[in-house]
A protein has these predicted regions:
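Noncatalytic scaffold domains of N-terminal-nucleophile
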Residues: 1-18, 22, 30-209, 215, ...
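Active-site rim segments in enzyme catalytic domains, especially the processed small/beta chain
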Residues: 44-50, 54-69, 75, 84, ...
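Internal alpha/beta scaffold segment
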Residues: 95, 204, 259-327, 531-532
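Short, small/polar residue-rich loop motifs at catalytic or cofactor-binding pockets
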Residues: 255, 346-349, 408-410
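Glycine-rich phosphate/pyrophosphate-binding beta-alpha loops
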Residues: 269-278, 349-353, 363-375, 427-434
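Internal maturation/activation junctions in enzymes
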Residues: 290-367, 487
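Extended C-terminal subregions enriched in glycine
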Residues: 320, 324, 358, 404, ...
């Protein structure tokens, strides 16, 4: 457990957490720390975060004001003819299961991350942007060491990161020579120290020139030569993409009211529609509210069966009703709650949570999808493949609505307990985000687990008719689940497949501490970086 005085941050990489902790120690607020960590994640976690991606930030000010900043991907304003589009299938191998995606420049939607960072800074930041981006510039220029988790990610989706010559040059290193004497290259491995000078230069330029460098000016003309906007427009035009200068120029960060809900003795804030994750979590909690979950021990098979049934009901409601506020209609909830009494029928994201000593809090989830395989020239950053993710674009290559903010499972969340505690959390994990967060919430609120226990407890996830569960479930629970769900997968270890919940809590007395999820190599640091 990490405890801190000025602030606490949990994130998916040591350098990401360190960047935020450094800013907290320098007197920055939670939002400054989150921005610094987000820049660093693009350097240290390039498979999960990129200048070419997007995300969501839940902010809560010490004065009580809360907002969602939506800087997720936007569909292009125009659609090219299918014969012109670069859109190719690829599969990620998690060992015991696979998940399909599509890549190519035609899979890229309008990225929002850079505009979102600047919008958050203008609204909530207290330190100069140059100071916040400084640690990331230094790391990109001086090098970061590849962690085992980052190496594992590359091994899972390696074909994407060697898909183009520019990607191969960036994400591989020389590894001797072949029999003919030609240089041989391999993907980054754990322990490699790698630099990204193009990214360092791009970050430096963004700190000086602002987000217009990435999105272009609002004058309606073509992007100026040498800008990132011009590079993206040219990449898309030449390599089968839909994006053009109008998409970039018109992109805006959207501010929304968080979705608010009550559960037991806690009040929760999470991501509202059009993102789907928060609403589906709210639906699941509303179903659980009619059950005395606290009376079921973690080792009770009935507890796991109830959670699996709630996941199935949520899946069915999403399929039958869509992801709209109608899901929280009391009559609809009663119908699905009654169904729970019946026997059951037979991606890349990362998260940052920060709270400072004044109780300012930020919960940020970002994603680059899996990346489309193409590097934005001059930036050392891969463009997203959001149009190629079936979960948020089920229509595929040419059936998406024009110029629309895309939905997402991402659900940065805050919990306000009646006793004065504040917790911010969120998860990566594509389709598993909502089930990971739901289970951690139940562990915290119903079972009164410590933050570490709640995050590290084994999880289950229902995907279609197949129930997945992690190693560590009591044998009696696993046996009962296997009987109830003939189509199942028992994972031999805790795995990133089940998400990565990084969380920070502020106790009623002001004490700050947090936990990074070991499934995704999570790290938690305080301003003094004093782990105990």
């Amino acid at each position: 457990m990490v405890r801190a005085e000025k602030g606490c941050i949990a994130a998916g990489h040591p350098k990401t957490a360190e960047a935020g902790a450094t800013i907290l120690a320098a007197g920055g607020n939670a939002f400054d720390a989150a921005i610094a960590a987000l820049w660093m994640s693009c350097v240290a976690e390039p498979v999960l975060a990129s200048l070419g991606g997007g995300g969501f930030c839940l902010t809560h000010g010490a004065g009580g004001d809360s907002r969602i900043y939506d800087f997720f991907a936007q569909t292009p304003r125009r659609r090219r003819a299918p014969a012109e589009v670069d859109f190719q299938p690829i599969y990620a191998d998690f060992g015991v299961t696979t998940q399909g995606f599509h890549i190519g420049v035609g899979a890229a939607a309008t990225p929002g991350l850079v505009r979102g960072i600047f919008a958050l800074h203008r609204a909530r930041g207290s330190l100069p942007m140059r100071e916040l981006v400084g640690p990331a510039i230094a790391a990109a220029a001086g090098g970061v060491t590849i962690t085992p988790f980052q190496a594992y990610l590359l091994s899972v989706i390696g074909p994407i990161y060697t898909h183009t010559p520019a990607a191969r040059a960036l994400f591989t290193v020389e590894d001797g020579a072949d029999e003919a004497g030609a240089p041989r290259r391999r993907l980054w491995q754990a322990g490699d120290r790698v630099t990204n000078p193009d990214l360092a230069d791009a970050l430096d330029a963004l700190a000086r020139e602002g987000d217009a460098l990435f999105y272009g000016d609002d004058d309606g003309g073509p992007p100026a030569p040498g800008t990132i906007a011009a590079a993206i427009s040219r990449l898309s035009a030449d390599h089968g993409g839909h994006l053009d200068a109008d998409d970039l120029r018109s992109y805006r960060t959207l501010e929304r009211e968080p979705l608010r809900l009550g559960y037991r003795d806690a009040h929760l804030l999470t991501n509202p529609p059009p993102a789907s994750g928060g609403l589906l979590i709210a639906f699941g909690l509303a179903l659980l509210a009619g059950h005395d979950v606290s009376a079921l021990s973690f080792a009770d098979p009935d507890r796991a069966a109830l959670l699996a049934a709630v996941m199935a009901a949520t899946r069915d409601a999403r399929r039958d009703r869509g992801v709209t506020p109608e899901l929280l209609d009391p009559a609809l909830l009663r119908a699905y709650a009654e169904a729970l009494a019946a026997p059951p029928a037979t991606r890349g994201t990362t998260h940052i949570s920060v709270i400072d000593r004044d109780a300012n809090a930020a919960s940020i989830t970002v994603s680059n999808g899996e990346g489309c395989g193409a590097i934005i020239p001059g930036t050392g950053s891969m463009l997203n493949n959001m149009l190629g993710e079936e979960d948020i674009n089920p229509g595929g290559a040419d059936a998406w609505p024009l110029d629309a903010r895309m939905g997402s499972m991402m659900a940065p969340t805050a919990i306000f307990a009646d006793d004065g505690r504040l917790c911010v959390l969120g998860s990566g994990g594509s389709k598993r985000i909502r089930t990971a967060i739901l289970q951690v919430l139940v562990n915290l609120i119903d079972h009164r687990m410590s933050l570490r226990e709640a995050v590290e407890a084994p999880r289950i996830h229902l995907e279609g008719a197949r129930l997945n569960w992690e190693a560590g479930l009591p044998a009696e629970v696993a046996e009962a689940l296997a009987r109830a769900y003939p189509e199942h997968t028992a994972w031999p270890e805790r795995n990133m497949y089940f998400g990565g919940v990084h969380a920070v809590i502020r106790e009623a007395d002001g004490e700050l501490h947090g936990v990074g999820d070991p499934r995704r190599a999570g790290v938690c640091l305080g301003d003094a970086r004093d782990a105990s």
